[in-house]
Design a protein with these regions (language model features):
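Core catalytic lobe of class I
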Residues: 1-137
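S-adenosyl-L-methionine
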Residues: 140-154
Length: 154
């Protein structure tokens, strides 16, 4: 397809599926790719300044850029469940580091439409493709009816 892999990010989540014959799966693989690495943007201080520290004195700037992300799942009472919906914080973090307002965000596997929803909330434009009819309908409904339901952070 012509994409360059920038990072292979691991999303570590709680409450994996417990099994009797193997280890519990409690992570998800996220590929961060771009079309043209020479024109790719990265804003290293978009979320934390170099001097920002956690309560235990660790650099927030450095920790935020590690490739294993411990981000809580999003649960909404009465929300339709889809296997493709990532927490908005994952997408928000990627977009804040890699794009500016009015940029176009492309998601070739749109799923539930979460990338489009978060892009819109951050004043980014978006293009997405989805070939699974049920996921397409779900994403279209969310976007058409402003059914965003994303967690507010910071």
């Amino acid at each position: 397809v012509g994409f360059t892999t920038i990072n292979h990010i691991i999303w570590k989540y709680q409450f994996g599926v417990v099994t009797k014959k193997k280890f519990v799966t409690s992570h998800y693989h996220c590929l961060y790719v771009c079309k043209d690495d020479k024109q790719r943007k990265f804003f290293p201080f978009s979320r934390f300044k170099k001097e920002d520290k956690s309560e235990n004195g660790r650099s927030l700037h450095y920790r935020d850029k590690e490739d294993v992300w411990d981000i809580k799942r999003e649960y909404w009472t009465g929300d339709e469940k889809t296997p493709t919906k990532l927490p908005s914080e994952i997408i928000k973090k990627l977009l804040e580091y890699s794009s500016e307002k009015k940029d176009i965000v492309f998601d070739p596997f749109l799923g539930s439409g979460q990338t489009a929803v978060v892009s819109k909330s951050l004043n980014r434009r978006f293009i997405g493709f989805e070939i699974v009819p049920d996921y397409y309908k779900f994403a279209k409904k969310r976007l058409d009816k402003d059914m965003y339901r994303i967690k507010k952070t910071k």
